[in-house]
Amino acid sequence: MYQDLIRNELNEAAETLANFLQDEANIHAIQRAAVLLADSFKAGGKVLSCGNGGSHCDAMHFAEELTGRYRENRPGYPAIAISDVSHLSCVSNDFGYEYVFSRYVESVGRAGDVLLGISTSGNSGNVIKAIEAARAQGMKVITLTGKDGGKMAGSADVEIRVPHFGYADRIQEIHIKVIHILIMLIEKEMVKG
């Protein structure tokens, strides 16, 4: 009944991943991002992560597997997804939704910390404002974007971009794989000392 549709969806996902893998720069960017994050943790820093919708869920997933557990038992790493409902609703009401992430970064971000900003379009205004706030705090910035990188293109120390111009879910599928690889590499870097 739906077998062809299912095959088409899985083939498109595989094709998107294959296209991402063809660009060796993506592999190097993932490695640079993981080392940057581990270096921050080793120096006493933390990572703040943010995004909207599915990207917000990815930001939470990233922080959860750093503070909790990925594949192996190990000490937790300092990671915070900007997802506190009282903060988000307060700032949205009092300042506007475009400031929900930047106000948090201004409040708890410090030099030596890292911001992970996630946006499939690269055009999320509140993530862009968070990047600006992170820069003002002396933080490093990593972005996970899609398509042509949007307005976020060129704004990060490390940008990991999925150059897919179809539906956003294909970009998100690569983002979550990248997030898992980042965590795996961070764990390896942290063991190195």
UniProtKB/Swiss-Prot annotation:
Molecular functions (GO terms): carbohydrate derivative binding; D-sedoheptulose 7-phosphate isomerase activity; zinc ion binding
Any one GO CC term of the record: cytoplasm
Note accompanying the cofactor annotation: Binds 1 zinc ion per subunit.
EC number: 5.3.1.28
Subcellular localization(s) per the UniProt record: Cytoplasm
Disulfide pairings: none
Matching Pfam families: SIS_2 (PF13580)
Main subcellular location of this protein, as a coarse class: cytoplasm
Tree of life domain: Bacteria
UniProt cofactor(s): Zn(2+)
PROSITE patterns recorded: SIS
UniProt cross-references to SUPFAM superfamilies, sorted A to Z: SIS domain (SSF53697)
Positions annotated to bind substrate: N52, G53, G54, E65, N93, D94, S119, T120, S121, S124, Q172
Keywords: Carbohydrate metabolism, Cytoplasm, Isomerase, Metal-binding, Zinc
Residues the entry annotates as binding Zn(2+): H61, E65, Q172, H180
GO biological process: carbohydrate metabolic process; D-glycero-D-manno-heptose 7-phosphate biosynthetic process
Family listed: Belongs to the SIS family. GmhA subfamily.
Note: The reaction produces a racemic mixture of D-glycero-alpha-D-manno-heptose 7-phosphate and D-glycero-beta-D-manno-heptose 7-phosphate.
Role of this protein: Catalyzes the isomerization of sedoheptulose 7-phosphate in D-glycero-D-manno-heptose 7-phosphate.
Listed PANTHER family: PHOSPHOHEPTOSE ISOMERASE, SEDOHEPTULOSE 7-PHOSPHATE ISOMERASE / DNAA INITIATOR-ASSOCIATING FACTOR FOR REPLICATION INITIATION
Protein name: Phosphoheptose isomerase
Gene that specifies this protein: gmhA
